[in-house]
Curated annotation (Swiss-Prot):
It comes from the Eukaryota. Its EC number is 2.7.1.-. This is ATP-dependent kinase YFH7. ATP-dependent kinase that could be involved in endoplasmic reticulum membrane assembly. It comes from Saccharomyces cerevisiae (strain Lalvin EC1118 / Prise de mousse) (Baker's yeast).
Amino acid sequence: MVDTHKLADDVLHLLDNRIEDNYRVCVILVGSPGSGKSTIAEELCQIINEKYHTFLSEHPNVIEVNDRLKPMVNLVDSLKTLQPNEVAEMIENQGLFKDHVEDVNFQPIKYSALTSNNEECTAVVARGGTANAIRIATVDNPVNVNKLAQDSINIAQIVPMDGFHLSRRCLDLFKDPQTAHKRRGSPSTFDSNNFLQLCKILAKTSLCKVSSHHKFYSTSSVFEKLSKTFSQTIPDIFVPGFNHALKDPTPDQYCISKFTRIVILEGLYLLYDQENWKKIYKTLADTGALLVYKIDIDYEATEERVAKRHLQSGLVTTIAEGREKFRSNDLLNGRDIDNHLIKVDNIVHIRND
């Protein structure tokens, strides 16, 4: 079993070491289907946030949100802007770019939009269209810390790769839609274009620094330091999740807020050495604030886990069908991950048998 408390300590240690140079740190957590990566990511996130909530309960009124950000950065200034007529055409096509659904070289583009909460934002879309959109909220009204419930302030946030599954409608437009649906979960059935763009956005926010008029000492805790260095000018970033009942992405399910100082990215292909995936590691590693974990587990253990999950999700009607689906798709993806793991020295291997 994985010691998630030890992982939490390692992540907080990295944040403590990098807090003068990085606004946030990132964690990559990779494993084959059924390896437990989602559960580990959720536990890790919960442990860190609970630790911070305990600190806040013992140190009321410690939080400060200021605008002393260096550098002031436009997160998507280099992206092409869609014109209103182009946005209208995209919407008419059910939020898709019909000619680019399989184009892994398609460059993400931006346009003005609204979040699901009706807030003004910049939407970033790629070959998966609006189903896999990233939405960056407009920074306007200052945060009133006094009106925030302390237990609502979370410094860690998970970002599952699952939200970047290409929608079923998108897969319908593939040259071979039958194979695309059968092999859903393979590398080509994710919007790797926009996930890489998300990593570029996160890297930019990571490299921002917030100056503080407080002098920190060697005895200052990491929670004390980050509580004094929240920035008003870091925008909230909304990313999609995945609805297993609907079998499609869910817009704006996760929010990487200005209070998020630790982003836990989990998924199958975040260390994959092919197409857009191969650029993710370097994009985040170049910030100097990254931890990378690969979960190792025997395929015999994952087969039963995944077969039961397929049954519970309604993808199959019997456990035997679940095992067959695992062997014809999930097992192939797991072996593909192991055969195409990027070659870097700082991947920490952990077992979850």
